[in-house]
Amino acid sequence: LYTYELANYPGGFYALQDGYLDSWHDGSFYKAVLSAQQPFAYSIPWNNQKIDVHPPLYYCLVYTAESLFPGLGLPWVGLLPNFVCILAGAAVLYCTAKRLIGRFWPAWTAAACWLLSVGVQGMAVFTRMYSLMMLEGIVLLYCHVVLWQALQAGQKPPRAVWPGLFAVTMAGALTQYFFLVFCFFVCGLFGIWLLAARRFKTAGGYVITEFAALAAAYAAFPTMKAHIFSGSRGKEAFASVFDLSALAEWGRSIGTVVQLLAAQFGGLWLWAVVVAAAAVVLWRRGCRLRGKGLFAAGLLLASAGYVALIDKAAPFEADRYYVVIYAAVVLAVAVVLARLAPKHETLLLLALVPILAAHRTDPNAYLYEDAAPRKAALADTERLPAVVLNKAGYEVAPDLFLEEFAKREAVDQASGEDDAASLRAAVESRDLHGGFLLYGYIYDADELRALAE
């Protein structure tokens, strides 16, 4: 729900505005926060992100959906951009694999495995920027495949590849700062290959394009410098990356993350054995690490580097920080498996079995099915006024209940300085004889009951 608030409410978080705390606000106030009151006024989400910790492009995408479909409502108006991004990502991944491998079934299987995986399905229903970041990551891979194939064939790179690289790098930088880490490994390894292959002219154009994209992103959103280097998340990430006092814990955490991600595709050991066995068979057939195999190895190496660095920098061991590498890994595995039995390519469809089975063993955590009992419990009181007490330590924490607030007659959020006094003042300033609901964020139930009595 923070996504909708940051997309729609001028000034960012309403709880930080003067006069909000310790006063009553009608439910219509919160309802307005959940929709675009000024269609296509992109200065609202763009400027709001200056006080947040993320860049603004995804919020502008949500704002576009709200402006185009004002009657669609929650959650569909937020899910629509996700669905578009993920379906487009599957289509571009198919085109990427088809171009790289050259055959239908490996490309179709790669796109299907990616699209149907637990992690990608999770991002489809999680109203944050990760679906857009995945699409941008796949477009980045497509541009590299086009460039790599042209160079391999001794041809001049197509002119369109340069604006493509520029646009996707700029867009990614304006979507999630972790995309820059993905670019660092993918582009860094590709740049090393260009130098090793003595493609100096192409390498120069490549470097200029990538850095020009970063400069353009900075020019469009200069606040990103403060976000990355002096913002709360940025300073936390850099401090964690350069803290070398707990390397053993870092190694343990990487193992946990790898197992978490692999579980969404059917398990780490299953795919480790499959890929290792395929590599051994191909080696014995005379296949070596060159051509498509070298490109696939680069994708896996870039993905491994990304996991290692993000695990050090990210605040949580959550799959959403890593889904951008899923397409790269799937593409690399597709390259390897497609070489095994080119005359029996439909057997590749068996890869879907563990991926679909993973929905049973490691289900989508972003459906929030545990919220169903809460909705049922609130059904009879959803329109009553509410007083909100908050012990989280930051004023915007209760914004998580924004959709509930929008249905209520009115809401009064305590300032947190003296909850007992705030509760007393709220009760005395409004006729609540018809009853009211008391929210206690991070309160013990008995403590909250005693405070109310």
Question: Model-derived features: where do they sit?
Answer:
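Transmembrane-helix motifs of polytopic, lipid-linked glycan transferases
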Residues: V77-I101, V139
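Membrane-interface alpha helices of multi-pass inner-membrane proteins
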Residues: A110, R159-Y177, G188, A212
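Hydrophobic, aromatic-rich transmembrane alpha-helices
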Residues: F190-L194, G266-R290
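Membrane-embedded, lumen/periplasm-facing catalytic core of multi-pass transferases
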Residues: V353-E409, S415
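Specific aromatic-rich, kink-prone transmembrane helix
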Residues: T64, V92-C95, A112, L116, ...
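Signature aromatic-anchored transmembrane alpha helix within multi-pass, membrane-resident enzymes
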Residues: R159, P163, A167, F211, ...
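Interfacial juxtamembrane loops and adjacent helix segments
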Residues: Y2-H54, E66-L72
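Hydrophobic/aromatic-rich transmembrane helices and adjacent perimembrane loops
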Residues: L132-L135, V181, L270-A272, L294, ...
